UniProtKB/Swiss-Prot annotation:
The gene is Msl3b. Residues 44-367 form the MRG domain. Residues 1-47, 160-230 are annotated as: Disordered. The lineage of its organism: Eukaryota, Metazoa, Chordata, Craniata, Vertebrata. PROSITE patterns: MRG. This is MSL complex subunit 3B. One of its GO terms (biological process) is chromatin organization. Gene3D superfamilies: MRG domain. Residues 8-47 have a biased composition (Basic and acidic residues).
Length: 371
């Protein structure tokens, strides 16, 4: 993980071997066979460059500093996990395409970079890749023990309790552990002092996120008098910056299609069915993952670790086979997603996400307190 902040290096060895083969006149046919794979690989690596915006590069540097120099950890599970970020982006992208007048009954006229279907495939591919790559290449050594703890079965609720919670939160596209619904007096009079302190700190941070500007993603739960309820539904929804829809006092869009969600799309070019389809789309089914299995990393980790993936992504994609057309479309969608992260980086990359190892350990031992 020492190279997380650095882009993968060019395969210089392959280039040297190719040069030596060309100079070997006694084995010209063999040299030709060896040169072409190296040449293709070097061309693929050049094509796989995924430029990371400067503001996100600074976030990577900050991440490295907090973990390695200040010995801090990201508090887990994150309030805004990778699945939530990807789902928010797909809705943001879909609404943007709809606002520009692209109708899905005529997909042949839409450019690949404006294809909602390709955007969804990209998001799902990132989720799957993140789940596989995180324990292998996305963790610093200091984070390994935390990973083993948060992915253990003891970190999450028993199956019976999770099943009952799932019935109360059918909307949620990720199975974040939902606490019982306490009364306000019970929430205030909880016995754990550290839990109260974190709840108060979260309540003081919330206005800073929601008042930054009127056109960005918000968590759906806005009841600041009940921090526990706010944590139990960490949903993001798009308030588009380049659309004619504006609200003096932004309110969250309901996940299920309804009057509230449709009202937020007033002025969009599109049918009610199109708008409802955007609002109701989910990255994964409600019953994923099964209740007897711990959630995957994309349900636990957040923007900090997702951004690390983009440092390793060129190397990962370089080992896959893509046609030139598909690769070009994929890279375009990845670039658009990075722009989205850069635009809302102040909301996704919070300094308060980094806590001392002791506090991170406490959070891991008390999964009811979602970050």
């Amino acid at each position: 993980m020492a190279t997380l902040g650095c882009a993968p290096k060019d395969d210089g060895e392959g280039k040297d071997e190719g040069g030596s083969d060309r100079g070997d006149g006694d084995s010209k046919p063999k040299g030709k066979k060896e040169v072409e794979p190296h040449t293709r690989r070097e061309a693929d690596e050049r094509a796989m460059r995924i430029p990371i915006p400067e503001v996100l590069q600074q976030r990577l540097a900050d991440d490295c500093y907090y973990i390695n120099r200040r010995r801090r950890l990201v508090r887990l599970p994150c309030q805004t996990n990778v699945g939530a970020i990807l789902e928010c982006y797909v809705r943001h992208f879909s609404a943007s395409v709809l606002a520009l007048g692209d109708r899905r009954p005529q997909p042949q006229r839409a450019a690949p970079e404006r294809s909602v279907g390709l955007c969804r495939e990209m998001a799902d591919g990132l989720r799957i890749t993140f789940d596989h790559a995180l324990p292998l290449v996305l963790l610093y050594p200091q984070e390994q023990a935390q990973y083993e703890m948060v992915t253990s079965s003891t970190f999450f609720f028993p199956t019976e309790e999770r099943a009952s919670d799932a019935g109360r939160s059918q909307e949620a596209p990720w199975p974040g552990p939902s606490p019982p619904q306490p009364s306000e007096s019970q929430a205030v009079a909880g016995p754990a002092a550290p839990k109260r302190r974190r709840a108060e700190a979260e309540a003081t941070r919330a206005p800073r996120r929601s008042t930054r500007h009127s056109t960005h993603c918000h968590w759906q739960a806005e009841d600041r008098a009940s921090p526990q309820a706010k944590r139990s539904v960490p949903k993001l929804f798009p308030h588009l910056q380049k659309t004619p829809v504006h609200s003096a006092a932004p309110s969250p869009i309901a996940l299920t299609p309804g009057k509230e969600g449709s009202a937020m799309f007033a002025g969009f070019e599109g049918t009610t069915e199109e708008i409802n389809e955007i609002l109701s789309w989910k990255l994964v089914p409600d019953n994923y993952p099964p209740g007897h299995q711990p959630p995957p990393p994309s349900y636990i980790y957040g923007a900090q670790h997702l951004l690390r993936l983009f440092v390793k992504l060129p190397e990962i994609l370089g080992k896959m086979s893509f046609s030139e057309k598909n690769l070009k479309a994929l890279l375009k969608h990845l670039d658009l997603f990075l722009r989205f992260l850069a635009e809302y980086q102040a909301d996704f990359f919070l300094e308060s996400a980094y806590v001392s190892a002791c506090e991170a350990h406490y959070s891991s031992k008390n999964p009811r307190t979602l970050c």
